[in-house]
Amino acid sequence: MKKTLLALVVAAASTSAFANVDTQNSKPEFEFDPMHKDQFSVSGAIGLGGYYDTASKALYDDWATAVTVATIYQNNRLRGYLEIDLEMNYSTDESKKAIQSGPATDVDKAWLGYETDFGLLSFGWENDTALDKVDGAGDTTYEFGSSAGDTSDAFNVIKFEGKASAFAYGISTFETDDDREAAETGYNGYFGVEQEVFNIYAGYETRENGNEDEEIVSLSGNVKVGAATLGANFWVNDLETSTNTGKTETGYYLSGSYPVTEQLTLAAGYNGVTTDSQVAGTADVDMSRVNIAAMYTLNDRVDMGIDILQDVDTGDSAKDEETYVFAAMFYSF
C-alpha cells in the first residue's frame, strides 16, 4: 500500500506554489514569456522507513526510504510538474516479500496543464487520477487507512479539476499500465463540498478490460469536532466478468485523530469489508481490522509517524490474524 506520505509533503508544496499564481491577471491567456529560471521551483523530501508484518516476519520497503524531488513550472496559465523518486528498496526475505533490495528510480508524476478560470486541465504521462485525490478523505491515520479500490497512479491521464465557491469537482480518463496492450481504460470523477469545518465527496469510477468490467462508487469525508477530526470512507467495488466469477465488495472505514500536543497527534481507525462472490456456492466473506497511529512533527521540515494494523477477523478460518507495522521519518525541503 502506498499512501505516499513523502509525496504528500511534496504535493502540499506544489499546491501552495500553484495557488500563489493569480489567473485573473492582465496578460492575455495564451501569451507566454520566454523560458526563464524564475519560472521553475523545486521542492522535495528525504524519507527513511519501512514495514514489518507477522505473516512474513520480514522488514521491507519499496517507496518510503527515498529522495523525492519535484520540479514545478509556471508561465502565465501554463503549468508543469515532474516528480522523481530515488529509492533505496529492501527486503530481508525476498522469497516472502518480492522486493529487490537495492537502488531504484521512479518517475512518479509527469504532466503539463493549463489553468482556466474554472480549474486545471492537464495531460499526464503518469499522474494521479481525479478520484484518487478524495477517496481517502475519511482517513485521519498515518498509513493503513482503507478506501475504495479505485485507480491511483495511472498513465496517459487527462484530468480536469477545479473549485467554485464551496464546490469541488474533478474528472479524468486514464490507462492503468504504460503497456497499452495490457492496460485497462478507465474513467472517474468526483463532486464535493469543502467547508472550513467539514468536507464531503461522492465519486465514481468505471474500468473495462476485455471480458471484465469494474465499477466503483465511493463516499468520503471528514469533520472537525473541536480539536478532533473524524472521518469516514464508504465504497462499493463491483467486478463483473463474462464467466460469472466476479464479486461485489462493500466496505467502510471510520477513523479519528486528536492532537495531544502541538507536535503529537494520535489516531485510530476501523475497517470492515463484506465480499459477495458471484461464484455459485461461495459464501460471503466478512473481514475487519483496526489500526492505531501516532504522528509527530518536530518542526516545519521534519515529521515522523508509526501505524500499527491488526486483523480482527480475516473472514477465513484458514488465515491467521496478522499484525502489520509501518514507521517512517521525513525531511522536507
Task: Identify the residue ranges that each predicted region occupies.
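Outer-membrane beta-barrel proteins
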Residues: 2-333
